[in-house]
Structures are given as C-alpha cells and as structure tokens.
C-alpha cells in the first residue's frame, strides 16, 4: 500500500478534543472523510466548529449556508463563553476586542461559497497548501446536501 509509512498522506489521529469521544473511541483522522449526520438543528455545525477550534490544526471550513458574520459570532461565543446575543453586540460595538479573541482561530481558513463544486474545493485546498506549505489537516464541508 502506498500510504504505509507515509504520515504526510494522512491517516494519523487528529488531536483529541472531547473526553466523550475518547471514551467511545471516536477518532478523527487526518485526510480521511468523517460524516457528522443528524436532523436539522441538532448542532452538527456547532460540533464541527468546536472540533475545528479545539483541534488547533490547519483547517479548511467550507460553509455553504452560513455567512461570515454568523460564524464569527458562534466562534466568538465558543472562545469567550458569551451568549450569541452578547457576542453579536461585542462584535458590532468593539470589533478590536472581537478580533483579539478570534485570533485563537487563525488556523481556520474559511470559504463561504454557497454552491462549491469539487474544483472550488480543490482550489481552496491548493491556496492553503501554497500559504502553509502543507495541506489542511482538517477539511469541513458544512451542509453537504445543499
């Protein structure tokens, strides 16, 4: 097999982020496809965002149905523990404070294309490879069905 002994190809475990996942042997691996499925409103996007934030690994996050402002508000809430309404107010009234907190997520690279194709995703990955000299360790496609 080509992948044996080649960690640069992928397969190594991503950093653990939730004890419940560890306890149940749920492991996300670099460059592998994992699907988070559930009913609308079940928290799939929130879980994906929390994974990206906590893993602290270079991440491409493609959000097809949520805008940049909403994602910044959710992320700020995760980082600070504020409610989303408090976070929205701080982002609007004190953007410098928000930017400082959001810097904890500088390892996440965003795409808000509402209808990305495979070529678009490949272009995003290539851009990150050129920027970092390596592929993103985690790729999140939020809302695969749209």
Tell where the protein language model's regions lie, with residue ranges.
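Conserved inter-motif catalytic segment of the P-loop NTP-binding fold
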Residues: 59-146
